[in-house]
């Protein structure tokens, strides 16, 4: 845990311990995904980054790469990914999900096809990836692959007093 002495010494603190804490599943948190649709039907997608715990020098995660970490097209839907970003980068996962919906697949079919794309890569699907998607009507689908056995996401629909947790 980062203590007062570490805070006082900042930035001259051992970074290895801070990195270890940032990637500890009991302490650290994942990338945050936001998929939204306004009253006019416009769709947007955005992701945070999981922080610098896995961002060692030279590594770029998928969050800032449109088409890998997130993608939206109001005509078809939106998608954003969390987990091992290299998998989403290699497969262009977020763009692929939206493209599959453009080709006529349901949001559920599109997400599962994108998972198959990642599994078909040389070396297969390595690590944990979660795909969050909505179709043009706002219908959600979330699939967690190689991840937590009980993954939940939050959904807030118009007219609801608060967001509700749903299993993936």
Task: List each language-model region with its residue ranges.
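N-terminal nucleophile
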Residues: 1-168
């Amino acid at each position: 845990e980062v203590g007062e002495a570490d805070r006082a010494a900042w930035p001259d603190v051992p970074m290895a311990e801070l990195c270890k804490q940032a990637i500890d599943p009991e302490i650290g948190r994942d990338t945050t995904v936001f998929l939204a649709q306004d009253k006019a039907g416009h769709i947007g997608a955005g992701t945070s980054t999981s922080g610098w715990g896995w961002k060692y020098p030279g590594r770029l995660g998928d969050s800032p790469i449109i088409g890998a970490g997130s993608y939206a097209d109001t005509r078809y839907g939106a998608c954003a990914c969390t987990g091992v970003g290299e998998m989403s980068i290699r497969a262009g996962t977020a763009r692929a999900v939206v493209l599959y919906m453009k080709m006529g697949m349901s949001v559920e079919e599109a997400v599962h096809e994108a998972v198959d794309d990642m599994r078909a890569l040389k070396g297969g699907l390595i690590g944990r990836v979660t795909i969050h998607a909505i179709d043009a009507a706002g219908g959600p689908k979330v699939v967690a692959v190689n991840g937590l056995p009980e993954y939940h996401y939050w959904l807030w629909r118009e007219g609801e007093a608060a967001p509700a947790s749903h299993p993936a």
